[in-house]
From Swiss-Prot:
It holds the Pfam family tRNA-synt_2. PANTHER family: ASPARTATE--TRNA LIGASE, MITOCHONDRIAL, ASPARTYL/LYSYL-TRNA SYNTHETASE. Transmembrane segments: none annotated. Belongs to the class-II aminoacyl-tRNA synthetase family. Type 1 subfamily. Homodimer. GO terms for cellular component: cytoplasm. Its EC number is 6.1.1.12. The gene is aspS. It comes from the Bacteria. GO terms for molecular function: aspartate-tRNA ligase activity; ATP binding; nucleic acid binding. Catalyzes the attachment of L-aspartate to tRNA(Asp) in a two-step reaction: L-aspartate is first activated by ATP to form Asp-AMP and then transferred to the acceptor end of tRNA(Asp). Signal peptide: none annotated. This is Aspartate--tRNA ligase. The keyword DNA-binding does not apply.
Amino acid sequence: MRSHYCGDVNRSHVGEEVTLVGWVNRSRDLGGVVFLDLRDREGVIQVVYDPDLPEVFDVASTLRSEFCVQVKGLVRARPDSQINDQMRTGEIEVLGKALTILNSAPALPINMDKNQHNTEEQRLKYRYLDLRRPEMAERIIFRSKVTSAVRRFLDGNGFLDIETPILTKATPEGARDYLVPSRTYKGQFFALPQSPQLFKQLLMMSGFDRYYQIVKCFRDEDLRADRQPEFTQIDIETSFMTSAQVMDKTEEMVRGLFKELLNVDLGEFPKMTFAEAMRRYGSDKPDLRNPLELVDVADLVKDVDFKVFQEPANDSEGRVAVLCVPGGASLSRKQLDEYGKYVNIYGAKGLAWMKVNELENGLEGIQSPVLKFLSEEVVKGILERTGAANGDLILFGADKANIVAEAMGALRLKVGEDFDLLQGDWKPLWVVDFPMFERTSDGGLHAMHHPFTAPSGITPAELEADPTAAISDAYDMVLNGCELGGGSVRIYDAEMQSAVFRILGINDEEAQEKFGFLLEALKYGTPPHAGLAFGLDRMVMLMTGASSIRDVMAFPKTTTAACPLTNAPGFANPVQLEELGVSVVEAKKEQE
Protein backbone atom coordinates (compact mmCIF):
# COMPACT_ATOMS: atom_id res chain seq x y z
CA MET A 1 0.00 0.00 0.00
CA ARG A 2 2.99 2.35 0.30
CA SER A 3 6.25 2.96 -1.52
CA HIS A 4 7.87 5.14 1.16
CA TYR A 5 7.40 6.34 4.73
CA CYS A 6 6.38 9.99 4.86
CA GLY A 7 9.44 11.07 6.84
CA ASP A 8 11.85 9.29 4.48
CA VAL A 9 10.98 11.22 1.32
CA ASN A 10 13.62 13.83 0.49
CA ARG A 11 15.14 15.91 -2.31
CA SER A 12 16.64 12.80 -3.94
CA HIS A 13 13.10 11.64 -4.75
CA VAL A 14 12.15 14.75 -6.75
CA GLY A 15 10.42 13.70 -9.97
CA GLU A 16 9.37 10.30 -8.62
CA GLU A 17 5.85 8.99 -8.17
CA VAL A 18 5.26 7.89 -4.56
CA THR A 19 2.49 6.14 -2.68
CA LEU A 20 2.11 7.18 0.96
CA VAL A 21 -0.22 6.13 3.76
CA GLY A 22 -0.83 7.70 7.12
CA TRP A 23 -3.00 10.08 9.09
CA VAL A 24 -4.07 13.63 8.39
CA ASN A 25 -2.02 15.75 10.75
CA ARG A 26 -3.51 18.98 9.46
CA SER A 27 -5.57 20.05 6.45
CA ARG A 28 -6.11 23.60 5.22
CA ASP A 29 -7.65 25.23 2.17
CA LEU A 30 -5.64 28.26 1.08
CA GLY A 31 -6.95 30.10 -1.93
CA GLY A 32 -8.49 27.12 -3.63
CA VAL A 33 -5.52 24.81 -2.98
CA VAL A 34 -5.71 22.12 -0.27
CA PHE A 35 -2.53 21.60 1.74
CA LEU A 36 -2.45 18.31 3.58
CA ASP A 37 0.15 17.39 6.23
CA LEU A 38 0.34 13.61 6.16
CA ARG A 39 1.90 11.83 9.15
CA ASP A 40 3.19 8.34 9.82
CA ARG A 41 5.63 6.96 12.38
CA GLU A 42 8.65 8.37 10.52
CA GLY A 43 7.48 11.95 10.13
CA VAL A 44 5.26 14.44 8.31
CA ILE A 45 5.16 15.46 4.65
CA GLN A 46 3.16 18.15 2.85
CA VAL A 47 0.79 17.05 0.09
CA VAL A 48 -0.78 19.61 -2.26
CA TYR A 49 -4.09 19.15 -4.10
CA ASP A 50 -5.24 21.70 -6.66
CA PRO A 51 -8.56 22.03 -8.56
CA ASP A 52 -7.05 20.65 -11.79
CA LEU A 53 -8.18 17.22 -10.60
CA PRO A 54 -11.69 18.08 -9.37
CA GLU A 55 -12.70 14.61 -8.15
CA VAL A 56 -9.54 14.24 -6.06
CA PHE A 57 -9.72 17.87 -4.92
CA ASP A 58 -13.29 17.42 -3.69
CA VAL A 59 -12.27 14.40 -1.61
CA ALA A 60 -9.27 16.30 -0.20
CA SER A 61 -11.58 19.14 0.83
CA THR A 62 -13.50 16.77 3.13
CA LEU A 63 -10.52 15.56 5.15
CA ARG A 64 -10.27 16.16 8.89
CA SER A 65 -7.64 15.41 11.51
CA GLU A 66 -6.75 11.72 11.94
CA PHE A 67 -8.49 10.47 8.82
CA CYS A 68 -6.46 7.48 7.63
CA VAL A 69 -5.65 7.95 3.94
CA GLN A 70 -3.59 6.73 1.00
CA VAL A 71 -1.95 9.36 -1.19
CA LYS A 72 -0.40 8.96 -4.63
CA GLY A 73 1.51 11.80 -6.20
CA LEU A 74 4.65 13.36 -7.65
CA VAL A 75 7.52 14.57 -5.45
CA ARG A 76 8.60 18.10 -6.30
CA ALA A 77 10.97 20.63 -4.77
CA ARG A 78 9.46 23.51 -2.85
CA PRO A 79 10.28 27.04 -3.95
CA ASP A 80 13.09 28.49 -1.82
CA SER A 81 10.66 30.88 -0.18
CA GLN A 82 8.50 27.96 1.01
CA ILE A 83 11.23 25.69 2.41
CA ASN A 84 10.41 24.72 6.00
CA ASP A 85 13.58 24.12 8.04
CA GLN A 86 11.49 22.82 10.95
CA MET A 87 10.45 19.72 8.96
CA ARG A 88 12.74 16.88 7.90
CA THR A 89 10.82 16.87 4.61
CA GLY A 90 10.70 20.66 4.44
CA GLU A 91 12.56 20.93 1.12
CA ILE A 92 9.97 18.97 -0.86
CA GLU A 93 6.26 18.36 -1.18
CA VAL A 94 4.02 15.89 -3.00
CA LEU A 95 1.65 17.03 -5.73
CA GLY A 96 -1.36 14.80 -5.09
CA LYS A 97 -2.71 12.80 -8.05
CA ALA A 98 -4.94 10.32 -6.19
CA LEU A 99 -6.47 10.08 -2.74
CA THR A 100 -8.22 7.22 -0.97
CA ILE A 101 -9.87 7.56 2.44
CA LEU A 102 -9.06 4.31 4.25
CA ASN A 103 -10.95 5.31 7.38
CA SER A 104 -12.56 8.42 8.80
CA ALA A 105 -12.41 9.79 12.34
CA PRO A 106 -14.95 11.71 14.45
CA ALA A 107 -14.10 14.77 16.53
CA LEU A 108 -11.06 13.87 18.62
CA PRO A 109 -11.26 13.36 22.41
CA ILE A 110 -7.72 14.67 22.90
CA ASN A 111 -5.66 17.48 21.41
CA MET A 112 -3.09 16.02 19.03
CA ASP A 113 -0.91 19.12 18.77
CA LYS A 114 0.17 19.94 22.31
CA ASN A 115 -0.17 17.53 25.17
CA GLN A 116 -0.42 20.32 27.75
CA HIS A 117 -4.08 20.59 26.76
CA ASN A 118 -4.69 16.96 27.79
CA THR A 119 -4.70 15.44 31.25
CA GLU A 120 -2.59 12.34 31.71
CA GLU A 121 -5.79 10.40 32.32
CA GLN A 122 -7.04 11.47 28.87
CA ARG A 123 -3.74 10.60 27.24
CA LEU A 124 -3.72 7.11 28.75
CA LYS A 125 -7.40 6.47 28.01
CA TYR A 126 -6.86 7.31 24.34
CA ARG A 127 -3.29 6.05 24.22
CA TYR A 128 -3.63 4.84 20.62
CA LEU A 129 -4.17 8.48 19.63
CA ASP A 130 -1.54 9.84 22.01
CA LEU A 131 1.08 7.51 20.52
CA ARG A 132 0.47 8.97 17.05
CA ARG A 133 1.86 12.30 18.19
CA PRO A 134 5.40 12.71 16.78
CA GLU A 135 7.14 13.21 20.13
CA MET A 136 5.58 10.03 21.51
CA ALA A 137 6.25 8.03 18.36
CA GLU A 138 9.88 9.18 18.40
CA ARG A 139 10.33 7.95 21.96
CA ILE A 140 8.85 4.52 21.26
CA ILE A 141 10.99 4.18 18.13
CA PHE A 142 14.05 5.30 20.11
CA ARG A 143 13.29 2.65 22.73
CA SER A 144 13.27 0.03 19.99
CA LYS A 145 16.66 1.28 18.80
CA VAL A 146 18.04 0.97 22.35
CA THR A 147 16.93 -2.64 22.75
CA SER A 148 18.22 -3.48 19.27
CA ALA A 149 21.64 -1.98 20.07
CA VAL A 150 21.75 -3.76 23.44
CA ARG A 151 21.03 -7.10 21.79
CA ARG A 152 23.70 -6.54 19.14
CA PHE A 153 26.31 -5.70 21.77
CA LEU A 154 25.50 -8.59 24.08
CA ASP A 155 25.11 -11.11 21.25
CA GLY A 156 28.46 -9.94 19.90
CA ASN A 157 30.10 -10.49 23.28
CA GLY A 158 28.99 -14.07 23.69
CA PHE A 159 25.91 -13.52 25.85
CA LEU A 160 22.96 -15.88 25.41
CA ASP A 161 19.37 -14.60 25.42
CA ILE A 162 17.58 -17.06 27.72
CA GLU A 163 14.02 -16.70 29.00
CA THR A 164 13.13 -17.32 32.64
CA PRO A 165 9.70 -18.12 34.15
CA ILE A 166 7.02 -15.51 34.72
CA LEU A 167 4.98 -17.76 37.01
CA THR A 168 7.33 -18.41 39.90
CA LYS A 169 7.62 -18.50 43.69
CA ALA A 170 7.42 -15.51 46.01
CA THR A 171 10.81 -14.47 47.40
CA PRO A 172 11.59 -11.52 49.69
CA GLU A 173 13.02 -8.85 47.37
CA GLY A 174 11.84 -5.71 49.11
CA ALA A 175 8.44 -5.01 47.53
CA ARG A 176 5.06 -6.72 47.55
CA ASP A 177 4.53 -9.49 45.03
CA TYR A 178 1.74 -9.76 42.50
CA LEU A 179 0.19 -13.13 43.28
CA VAL A 180 -1.50 -15.51 40.83
CA PRO A 181 -3.77 -18.19 42.37
CA SER A 182 -3.28 -21.76 41.19
CA ARG A 183 -6.39 -23.61 40.00
CA THR A 184 -4.79 -27.05 40.35
CA TYR A 185 -3.26 -26.39 43.78
CA LYS A 186 -6.07 -24.79 45.75
CA GLY A 187 -4.91 -22.20 48.26
CA GLN A 188 -1.48 -21.91 46.67
CA PHE A 189 -0.15 -19.03 44.61
CA PHE A 190 2.43 -18.22 42.01
CA ALA A 191 4.17 -14.84 42.17
CA LEU A 192 5.08 -12.67 39.22
CA PRO A 193 8.85 -12.08 39.36
CA GLN A 194 10.24 -8.86 40.81
CA SER A 195 13.38 -9.82 38.90
CA PRO A 196 14.85 -13.00 37.39
CA GLN A 197 17.53 -12.94 40.12
CA LEU A 198 17.48 -16.55 41.30
CA PHE A 199 16.84 -18.05 37.88
CA LYS A 200 19.77 -16.23 36.33
CA GLN A 201 21.98 -17.47 39.16
CA LEU A 202 20.71 -20.99 38.49
CA LEU A 203 21.63 -20.50 34.83
CA MET A 204 25.20 -19.75 35.93
CA MET A 205 25.15 -22.99 37.92
CA SER A 206 23.91 -24.70 34.75
CA GLY A 207 26.99 -23.64 32.80
CA PHE A 208 25.55 -20.82 30.66
CA ASP A 209 28.30 -18.42 31.67
CA ARG A 210 27.00 -15.32 29.87
CA TYR A 211 23.25 -14.65 30.02
CA TYR A 212 21.03 -11.72 29.22
CA GLN A 213 17.34 -11.06 28.90
CA ILE A 214 15.20 -7.99 28.21
CA VAL A 215 12.52 -8.96 30.66
CA LYS A 216 9.30 -7.78 32.28
CA CYS A 217 9.37 -7.49 36.07
CA PHE A 218 6.53 -6.80 38.49
CA ARG A 219 6.40 -4.99 41.84
CA ASP A 220 3.30 -4.06 43.78
CA GLU A 221 4.64 -0.87 45.34
CA ASP A 222 3.73 2.77 45.75
CA LEU A 223 4.29 4.56 42.46
CA ARG A 224 5.99 7.80 41.48
CA ALA A 225 7.27 9.38 38.27
CA ASP A 226 9.92 6.72 37.65
CA ARG A 227 8.08 3.65 38.96
CA GLN A 228 5.52 1.32 37.37
CA PRO A 229 3.93 -1.94 38.57
CA GLU A 230 5.37 -3.66 35.50
CA PHE A 231 8.67 -2.51 34.08
CA THR A 232 11.46 -3.78 31.86
CA GLN A 233 14.99 -4.74 32.84
CA ILE A 234 18.07 -5.38 30.76
CA ASP A 235 19.17 -8.32 32.87
CA ILE A 236 22.77 -9.57 32.69
CA GLU A 237 24.67 -12.32 34.52
CA THR A 238 28.15 -13.76 34.01
CA SER A 239 30.34 -16.49 35.47
CA PHE A 240 34.09 -16.22 36.04
CA MET A 241 34.12 -12.42 35.84
CA THR A 242 35.07 -10.07 38.67
CA SER A 243 33.03 -7.03 39.63
CA ALA A 244 35.58 -4.82 37.84
CA GLN A 245 35.19 -6.86 34.65
CA VAL A 246 31.39 -6.70 34.79
CA MET A 247 31.57 -2.95 35.31
CA ASP A 248 33.98 -2.52 32.40
CA LYS A 249 31.82 -4.59 30.04
CA THR A 250 28.51 -2.93 30.91
CA GLU A 251 30.09 0.53 30.86
CA GLU A 252 31.35 -0.27 27.36
CA MET A 253 27.78 -1.14 26.38
CA VAL A 254 26.28 2.08 27.77
CA ARG A 255 28.98 4.27 26.27
CA GLY A 256 28.33 2.58 22.93
CA LEU A 257 24.59 3.24 23.23
CA PHE A 258 25.11 6.94 23.84
CA LYS A 259 27.60 7.25 21.00
CA GLU A 260 25.47 5.33 18.48
CA LEU A 261 22.08 6.84 19.33
CA LEU A 262 22.90 10.32 20.65
CA ASN A 263 26.42 10.90 19.28
CA VAL A 264 27.53 11.59 22.86
CA ASP A 265 30.96 10.59 24.17
CA LEU A 266 30.47 9.82 27.86
CA GLY A 267 34.14 9.15 28.56
CA GLU A 268 35.39 6.86 31.30
CA PHE A 269 33.08 6.63 34.31
CA PRO A 270 34.65 7.73 37.61
CA LYS A 271 34.19 5.53 40.69
CA MET A 272 33.06 6.75 44.10
CA THR A 273 32.47 4.81 47.29
CA PHE A 274 29.06 4.80 48.93
CA ALA A 275 30.55 6.51 52.00
CA GLU A 276 32.04 9.34 49.94
CA ALA A 277 28.83 9.84 47.97
CA MET A 278 26.77 10.12 51.15
CA ARG A 279 29.31 12.44 52.77
CA ARG A 280 29.67 14.82 49.83
CA TYR A 281 26.21 14.66 48.27
CA GLY A 282 23.83 13.11 50.79
CA SER A 283 22.86 10.49 48.20
CA ASP A 284 24.10 7.17 46.87
CA LYS A 285 23.11 8.32 43.37
CA PRO A 286 24.61 11.82 43.19
CA ASP A 287 23.94 14.18 40.31
CA LEU A 288 27.46 15.36 39.50
CA ARG A 289 26.16 18.12 37.22
CA ASN A 290 25.38 19.99 40.44
CA PRO A 291 28.59 21.56 41.88
CA LEU A 292 27.20 21.94 45.42
CA GLU A 293 28.62 19.63 48.10
CA LEU A 294 27.81 19.02 51.74
CA VAL A 295 30.56 20.21 54.08
CA ASP A 296 30.88 18.74 57.57
CA VAL A 297 31.24 21.28 60.39
CA ALA A 298 30.43 19.16 63.47
CA ASP A 299 33.95 19.63 64.85
CA LEU A 300 33.54 23.41 64.60
CA VAL A 301 30.19 23.61 66.41
CA LYS A 302 30.48 20.80 68.99
CA ASP A 303 31.09 23.29 71.83
CA VAL A 304 28.62 26.04 70.89
CA ASP A 305 25.83 26.97 73.28
CA PHE A 306 23.12 25.90 70.83
CA LYS A 307 21.62 22.45 71.32
CA VAL A 308 20.39 22.19 67.73
CA PHE A 309 24.05 22.08 66.63
CA GLN A 310 25.76 20.84 69.78
CA GLU A 311 23.79 17.63 70.34
CA PRO A 312 24.16 16.07 66.87
CA ALA A 313 27.77 17.29 66.72
CA ASN A 314 28.53 15.20 69.82
CA ASP A 315 26.36 12.23 68.85
CA SER A 316 28.16 9.29 67.23
CA GLU A 317 25.12 8.85 64.99
CA GLY A 318 24.64 12.59 64.38
CA ARG A 319 25.90 15.01 61.80
CA VAL A 320 26.12 18.75 61.20
CA ALA A 321 26.69 19.68 57.56
CA VAL A 322 26.27 22.81 55.46
CA LEU A 323 25.63 23.80 51.87
CA CYS A 324 27.21 26.98 50.52
CA VAL A 325 24.99 28.50 47.83
CA PRO A 326 26.71 31.02 45.52
CA GLY A 327 24.64 34.21 45.34
CA GLY A 328 22.10 32.83 47.78
CA ALA A 329 22.22 35.83 50.13
CA SER A 330 19.72 37.53 47.83
CA LEU A 331 16.95 35.19 48.98
CA SER A 332 14.12 36.71 51.01
CA ARG A 333 13.07 35.43 54.41
CA LYS A 334 9.94 33.99 52.79
CA GLN A 335 12.04 32.04 50.28
CA LEU A 336 14.25 30.72 53.07
CA ASP A 337 11.15 29.64 55.00
CA GLU A 338 10.03 27.70 51.91
CA TYR A 339 13.33 25.83 51.93
CA GLY A 340 12.73 25.12 55.61
CA LYS A 341 9.36 23.59 54.79
CA TYR A 342 10.98 21.58 52.01
CA VAL A 343 13.50 19.86 54.31
CA ASN A 344 10.65 19.12 56.75
CA ILE A 345 9.38 16.63 54.16
CA TYR A 346 12.57 14.62 54.68
CA GLY A 347 12.44 14.59 58.46
CA ALA A 348 14.50 17.69 59.23
CA LYS A 349 13.14 19.80 62.08
CA GLY A 350 14.26 23.09 60.58
CA LEU A 351 16.84 24.89 58.47
CA ALA A 352 19.29 27.35 59.97
CA TRP A 353 20.95 29.78 57.57
CA MET A 354 23.70 32.35 57.35
CA LYS A 355 23.98 35.15 54.78
CA VAL A 356 27.47 36.36 53.90
CA ASN A 357 27.03 40.06 53.16
CA GLU A 358 30.46 41.59 53.84
CA LEU A 359 33.26 39.22 54.80
CA GLU A 360 35.63 42.09 55.47
CA ASN A 361 33.43 43.33 58.35
CA GLY A 362 33.65 40.14 60.42
CA LEU A 363 30.51 39.20 62.37
CA GLU A 364 28.88 42.50 61.43
CA GLY A 365 28.98 41.41 57.80
CA ILE A 366 27.11 38.18 58.58
CA GLN A 367 23.33 37.88 58.91
CA SER A 368 21.82 34.85 60.65
CA PRO A 369 19.16 34.05 63.26
CA VAL A 370 21.68 31.74 64.99
CA LEU A 371 24.62 34.15 64.88
CA LYS A 372 24.22 34.98 68.58
CA PHE A 373 25.13 31.39 69.45
CA LEU A 374 28.31 31.32 67.36
CA SER A 375 31.66 32.83 68.24
CA GLU A 376 33.71 34.75 65.72
CA GLU A 377 36.16 31.84 65.63
CA VAL A 378 33.40 29.34 64.79
CA VAL A 379 31.96 31.58 62.07
CA LYS A 380 35.41 32.14 60.62
CA GLY A 381 36.03 28.38 60.56
CA ILE A 382 32.74 27.73 58.74
CA LEU A 383 33.43 30.46 56.18
CA GLU A 384 36.94 29.19 55.50
CA ARG A 385 35.89 25.57 55.20
CA THR A 386 33.08 26.35 52.76
CA GLY A 387 35.05 28.93 50.79
CA ALA A 388 32.12 31.32 51.12
CA ALA A 389 32.30 34.70 49.40
CA ASN A 390 30.27 37.89 49.64
CA GLY A 391 26.70 37.28 48.50
CA ASP A 392 26.72 33.58 49.39
CA LEU A 393 24.26 31.71 51.59
CA ILE A 394 25.13 28.90 54.01
CA LEU A 395 22.39 26.40 54.89
CA PHE A 396 22.73 24.11 57.93
CA GLY A 397 21.54 20.55 58.48
CA ALA A 398 21.86 19.17 62.02
CA ASP A 399 20.28 15.88 63.11
CA LYS A 400 20.87 12.14 62.88
CA ALA A 401 23.27 11.47 60.02
CA ASN A 402 20.67 9.69 57.89
CA ILE A 403 18.20 12.58 58.21
CA VAL A 404 20.89 15.16 57.39
CA ALA A 405 21.93 13.17 54.34
CA GLU A 406 18.39 12.77 53.03
CA ALA A 407 17.21 16.32 53.78
CA MET A 408 20.35 18.17 52.73
CA GLY A 409 20.84 15.89 49.73
CA ALA A 410 17.33 16.73 48.52
CA LEU A 411 17.86 20.42 49.28
CA ARG A 412 21.11 20.34 47.29
CA LEU A 413 19.19 19.16 44.24
CA LYS A 414 16.41 21.72 44.67
CA VAL A 415 18.83 24.61 45.16
CA GLY A 416 20.83 23.46 42.16
CA GLU A 417 17.69 23.59 40.01
CA ASP A 418 16.44 26.88 41.49
CA PHE A 419 19.79 28.64 40.95
CA ASP A 420 20.42 27.04 37.55
CA LEU A 421 23.71 25.56 38.75
CA LEU A 422 23.72 22.33 36.71
CA GLN A 423 26.83 22.01 34.55
CA GLY A 424 27.09 19.76 31.49
CA ASP A 425 24.60 17.38 29.95
CA TRP A 426 25.77 13.96 31.15
CA LYS A 427 27.69 13.03 34.30
CA PRO A 428 27.93 9.25 34.83
CA LEU A 429 29.72 7.44 37.64
CA TRP A 430 29.95 4.13 39.46
CA VAL A 431 29.07 3.99 43.15
CA VAL A 432 30.81 1.07 44.89
CA ASP A 433 31.55 -0.40 48.33
CA PHE A 434 28.02 -0.36 49.69
CA PRO A 435 27.39 -1.66 53.20
CA MET A 436 26.04 -5.21 53.16
CA PHE A 437 23.23 -4.31 55.55
CA GLU A 438 21.34 -1.31 56.84
CA ARG A 439 19.29 -0.87 60.00
CA THR A 440 15.51 -1.02 59.83
CA SER A 441 13.24 1.19 61.92
CA ASP A 442 12.73 -1.65 64.41
CA GLY A 443 16.47 -2.17 64.88
CA GLY A 444 16.78 -5.20 62.64
CA LEU A 445 18.97 -5.59 59.58
CA HIS A 446 17.98 -5.38 55.93
CA ALA A 447 20.07 -6.28 52.87
CA MET A 448 20.99 -3.02 51.15
CA HIS A 449 20.88 -4.67 47.72
CA HIS A 450 19.40 -8.17 48.08
CA PRO A 451 20.15 -11.28 50.16
CA PHE A 452 22.23 -12.88 47.40
CA THR A 453 24.91 -10.15 47.24
CA ALA A 454 28.38 -11.33 48.27
CA PRO A 455 30.40 -9.53 50.93
CA SER A 456 33.87 -8.34 50.01
CA GLY A 457 36.83 -10.24 51.49
CA ILE A 458 35.20 -11.78 54.56
CA THR A 459 34.35 -15.27 55.85
CA PRO A 460 30.88 -16.39 56.97
CA ALA A 461 32.04 -16.41 60.62
CA GLU A 462 33.46 -12.90 60.36
CA LEU A 463 30.29 -11.69 58.68
CA GLU A 464 28.04 -13.04 61.43
CA ALA A 465 30.34 -11.65 64.12
CA ASP A 466 29.98 -8.05 62.87
CA PRO A 467 27.50 -7.78 59.98
CA THR A 468 27.16 -3.99 60.07
CA ALA A 469 30.86 -3.59 59.31
CA ALA A 470 30.68 -5.71 56.16
CA ILE A 471 31.08 -4.12 52.73
CA SER A 472 29.37 -5.74 49.76
CA ASP A 473 30.95 -6.41 46.39
CA ALA A 474 28.20 -4.35 44.75
CA TYR A 475 28.11 -1.54 42.23
CA ASP A 476 25.54 0.92 40.88
CA MET A 477 25.77 2.85 37.62
CA VAL A 478 24.46 6.37 38.15
CA LEU A 479 23.71 9.03 35.54
CA ASN A 480 22.57 12.57 36.34
CA GLY A 481 21.27 11.54 39.75
CA CYS A 482 19.39 8.47 38.51
CA GLU A 483 20.38 4.87 39.07
CA LEU A 484 20.67 3.37 35.60
CA GLY A 485 21.54 -0.08 36.87
CA GLY A 486 22.78 -1.99 39.86
CA GLY A 487 24.54 -5.26 40.39
CA SER A 488 26.94 -7.29 42.47
CA VAL A 489 29.04 -10.37 42.80
CA ARG A 490 26.72 -13.11 44.04
CA ILE A 491 27.16 -15.50 46.92
CA TYR A 492 28.25 -18.83 45.47
CA ASP A 493 28.88 -20.68 48.73
CA ALA A 494 26.02 -22.36 50.64
CA GLU A 495 27.58 -21.62 54.03
CA MET A 496 27.86 -17.90 53.26
CA GLN A 497 24.30 -17.80 51.91
CA SER A 498 22.97 -19.46 55.08
CA ALA A 499 24.90 -16.96 57.20
CA VAL A 500 23.29 -14.04 55.36
CA PHE A 501 19.84 -15.56 55.82
CA ARG A 502 20.44 -15.91 59.58
CA ILE A 503 21.62 -12.29 59.84
CA LEU A 504 18.39 -11.22 58.13
CA GLY A 505 16.32 -13.18 60.64
CA ILE A 506 15.54 -16.04 58.25
CA ASN A 507 16.04 -19.22 60.27
CA ASP A 508 17.20 -22.48 58.74
CA GLU A 509 13.67 -23.88 58.50
CA GLU A 510 12.33 -20.80 56.70
CA ALA A 511 15.41 -20.71 54.47
CA GLN A 512 14.78 -24.30 53.40
CA GLU A 513 11.12 -23.56 52.73
CA LYS A 514 11.78 -20.47 50.61
CA PHE A 515 15.25 -21.07 49.21
CA GLY A 516 15.93 -24.77 49.64
CA PHE A 517 16.36 -25.20 45.88
CA LEU A 518 19.04 -22.47 45.85
CA LEU A 519 20.93 -23.83 48.88
CA GLU A 520 20.87 -27.29 47.31
CA ALA A 521 22.12 -25.99 43.95
CA LEU A 522 24.96 -24.08 45.62
CA LYS A 523 26.47 -27.41 46.74
CA TYR A 524 27.12 -28.67 43.22
CA GLY A 525 30.16 -26.80 41.93
CA THR A 526 28.59 -23.36 41.65
CA PRO A 527 30.96 -21.02 39.78
CA PRO A 528 31.84 -17.50 40.94
CA HIS A 529 29.32 -15.25 39.23
CA ALA A 530 28.20 -11.65 39.08
CA GLY A 531 25.69 -9.55 37.23
CA LEU A 532 23.82 -6.34 36.78
CA ALA A 533 20.36 -5.18 35.75
CA PHE A 534 19.52 -1.92 33.99
CA GLY A 535 16.12 -0.26 34.15
CA LEU A 536 15.30 0.05 30.44
CA ASP A 537 12.40 2.45 31.00
CA ARG A 538 14.49 4.82 33.09
CA MET A 539 17.41 4.65 30.67
CA VAL A 540 15.19 5.59 27.72
CA MET A 541 13.54 8.32 29.79
CA LEU A 542 16.93 9.93 30.45
CA MET A 543 18.19 9.53 26.90
CA THR A 544 15.05 11.09 25.37
CA GLY A 545 14.62 13.83 27.97
CA ALA A 546 11.14 12.60 28.92
CA SER A 547 9.80 13.70 32.30
CA SER A 548 8.37 10.30 33.26
CA ILE A 549 8.90 6.66 32.34
CA ARG A 550 5.22 6.65 31.37
CA ASP A 551 6.21 8.71 28.34
CA VAL A 552 8.58 6.01 27.06
CA MET A 553 6.25 3.04 27.58
CA ALA A 554 3.59 2.18 25.02
CA PHE A 555 0.84 1.30 27.49
CA PRO A 556 1.78 2.33 31.04
CA LYS A 557 -0.35 2.39 34.17
CA THR A 558 -1.36 5.50 36.09
CA THR A 559 0.19 6.46 39.42
CA THR A 560 -2.59 4.41 41.03
CA ALA A 561 -1.59 1.31 39.02
CA ALA A 562 -4.68 1.41 36.79
CA CYS A 563 -5.13 1.33 33.02
CA PRO A 564 -7.73 3.90 31.85
CA LEU A 565 -7.63 2.40 28.34
CA THR A 566 -8.80 -1.10 29.31
CA ASN A 567 -10.26 -0.24 32.74
CA ALA A 568 -7.90 -2.73 34.37
CA PRO A 569 -7.89 -4.00 37.04
CA GLY A 570 -11.44 -5.33 37.02
CA PHE A 571 -13.65 -7.65 39.01
CA ALA A 572 -13.29 -11.37 38.32
CA ASN A 573 -16.16 -13.60 37.27
CA PRO A 574 -17.54 -15.44 40.36
CA VAL A 575 -17.27 -18.74 38.48
CA GLN A 576 -13.56 -18.14 37.92
CA LEU A 577 -13.07 -17.30 41.58
CA GLU A 578 -14.86 -20.49 42.61
CA GLU A 579 -12.64 -22.56 40.30
CA LEU A 580 -9.59 -20.96 41.88
CA GLY A 581 -10.84 -21.46 45.41
CA VAL A 582 -10.63 -17.72 46.01
CA SER A 583 -13.20 -15.66 47.89
CA VAL A 584 -13.27 -11.87 48.01
CA VAL A 585 -13.40 -10.63 51.59
CA GLU A 586 -14.17 -7.04 50.65
CA ALA A 587 -14.09 -5.13 47.39
CA LYS A 588 -14.98 -1.48 47.08
CA LYS A 589 -15.07 0.04 43.65
CA GLU A 590 -13.82 3.60 43.77
CA GLN A 591 -16.47 6.11 42.84
CA GLU A 592 -15.67 7.99 39.70
